[in-house]
């Protein structure tokens, strides 16, 4: 597989179960090692990073959003978001400023003092999104981020992704098997049997028009993919 991601792009990676999309994400995140080939980010081959260099790369350059939120139950929403900055030794005043700015962007100011068990699934995922974005990473990796959400919460999260992409120039790489979710991206890469199958760009199309284009490819691709509008 060979493709490029430009700074500020919002890309969805689609494919049936077992197609290799999550493995691809794991390789880009350096959680899995590649057996061959190279992965470049900002001019550096990240497959060659080891030890402290690798830890620093993950901490400073990547943001992660998972299907199951992965929030710490003993911390409030504010503390969960702030943790990523505390690890980087950001001053407390700056942490407070950045957490509140991100919370305002994602409309979660009202839950900052709440613990995960006090929040809805959609709120928890937006807190997780804020945690991933607050460090201003070079790349945000999202693995099935809407998988545990109802349709309303999923739509709100995806609209938040679009806002962050547009206003903060956030670079987002999102794995999904859902055409509705993918239709919020600006580009969709389709993978089949570990290989690049097709690629679509949204251009000036509406979200619904792009959804229809995605569904045309899904029909050709086959496999276990969702068809919700």
Task: List each model region and its residues.
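ABC family nucleotide-binding domain
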Residues: 1-187, 191
């Amino acid at each position: 597989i060979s493709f490029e991601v430009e700074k500020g792009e919002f890309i969805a990676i689609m494919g049936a179960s077992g197609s290799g999309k999550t493995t691809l994400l794991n390789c880009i995140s350096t959680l899995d090692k590649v057996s061959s080939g190279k992965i470049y980010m900002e001019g550096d081959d990240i497959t060659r990073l080891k030890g402290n260099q690798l830890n620093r790369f993950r901490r400073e350059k990547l943001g992660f959003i998972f299907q199951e939120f992965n929030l710490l139950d003993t911390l409030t929403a504010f503390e969960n978001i702030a943790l990523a900055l505390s690890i980087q030794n950001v001053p407390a005043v700056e942490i407070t400023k950045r957490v509140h700015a991100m919370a305002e962007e994602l409309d979660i100011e009202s839950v900052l003092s709440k613990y995960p068990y006090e929040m809805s699934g959609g709120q928890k995922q937006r807190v997780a999104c804020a945690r991933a974005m607050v460090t201003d990473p070079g790349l945000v990796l999202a693995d099935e981020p809407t998988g545990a959400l109802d349709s309303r919460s999923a739509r709100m999260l995806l609209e938040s992704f679009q806002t962050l992409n547009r206003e903060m120039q956030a670079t987002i790489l999102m794995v999904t098997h859902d055409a509705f979710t993918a239709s919020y991206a600006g580009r969709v890469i389709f993978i089949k049997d570990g290989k690049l199958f097709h690629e679509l760009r949204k251009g000036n199309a509406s979200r619904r028009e792009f959804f229809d284009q995605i569904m045309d490819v899904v029909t050709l691709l086959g496999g276990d993919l969702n068809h919700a509008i």
